[in-house]
Amino acid sequence: MSVIPSSRPVSTLAPDNDFREIHNWTELLHLFNQTFSDCHMELNENTKQVVLFVFYLAIFVVGLVENVLVICVNCRRSGRVGMLNLYILNMAVADLGIILSLPVWMLEVMLEYTWLWGSFSCRFIHYFYLANMYSSIFFLTCLSIDRYVTLTNTSPSWQRHQHRIRRAVCAGVWVLSAIIPLPEVVHIQLLDGSEPMCLFLAPFETYSAWALAVALSATILGFLLPFPLIAVFNILSACRLRRQGQTESRRHCLLMWAYIVVFVICWLPYHVTMLLLTLHTTHIFLHCNLVNFLYFFYEIIDCFSMLHCVANPILYNFLSPSFRGRLLSLVVRYLPKEQARAAGGRASSSSSTQHSIIITKEGSLPLQRICTPTPSETCRPPLCLRTPHLHSAIP
């Protein structure tokens, strides 16, 4: 799933006098096993395999359910409302693609990184994972930017062309994400032997340069460029909402800070670890025990980064009252009539005490929701929004 292969890329770890005697990858891996064994550190590989399997399984089950629900609910809505929903829908598709690749990684872990699925799947599974990983990050970035633009831009030109612009951006993201992994995937090969392994094997003489180039490009495109954009535009959106002083502005501001924090937690450890291991001995020198420690936990950190597939549906969908209402409506459709009537009654009762703003068309003024009060309550006056896009700009 990265430029750090499971067997550890050691062309830069071997001593110079031994390295001159190495002529192919098999000899290099054999030398590495001898060199690495000289660094003693008590780390239980069996425990790590169990932890990885459980972690992968939990992410797979929870992420699969969440993203399928997000896609189902938003597909029903996207034909009628577009708005920022398009980015959320595409991000869920990308996250689902990552989730669907997890069973292969789980089996690979349990087989101690023996690859049993042939040369084609070795490249394709890695390509499929990387393309969806970049897509998810890019759609998250586009969503952060577009949310701020939607909150601040009321020009007629934007109102007329925003649907077309969003569709073009989404298409461009998929194309870009399909191209970016190619330099890495081209050098992913199946190393034959009694226990074949799927590894990043760039040309032997220039392996260090290739590994560094791929690692730097992954960090730049996957973190250093998206993170400032996500942080800046979410902070700007939060400041904009706070100035408006709406009832829900505090909750929305906290959500936007949560978007930033979750992105950092998921991706910063992964990129720092990958860069340290790639730069080791060629540009920096790390102690033997630290290298051993980083290699041991790299796969756990890599797996931990996939938590964004679980966090994204929660942050951008399930915390939204409108999404939960649409999800309940979708569930009610498939319930038996009596249960559906009871669920519908509960949904109606809970929603009658909430005030909401409905956007009938993009760019139109908000209308007051029709309220039918119960004997114990009265209708509250509508909230006045300074922008007609607040409801649609906050998932």
Curated annotation (Swiss-Prot):
Give a GO biological-process term: response to hypoxia
Task: Spell out which residues lie on the membrane's Extracellular side.
Answer: 1-53, 110-123, 190-213, 277-295
Q: Does the keyword Cell membrane apply?
A: yes
Instruction: Assign the protein's first listed, main location to one coarse class.
Output: membrane
What does this protein do, in the record's words? Orphan receptor.
Q: Name one Pfam family in it.
A: 7tm_1
Give the protein family.
Answer: Belongs to the G-protein coupled receptor 1 family.
Q: Keyword Chaperone: yes or no?
A: no
What InterPro entries does the record point to?
G10D_rcpt, GPCR_Rhodpsn, GPCR_Rhodpsn_7TM, GPER1-like
Please name the GO terms that the record assigns under molecular function. adrenomedullin receptor activity
The source organism is Rattus norvegicus
What is the name of the protein in this document? G-protein coupled receptor 182
- Give the modified residues of type Phosphoserine: S329
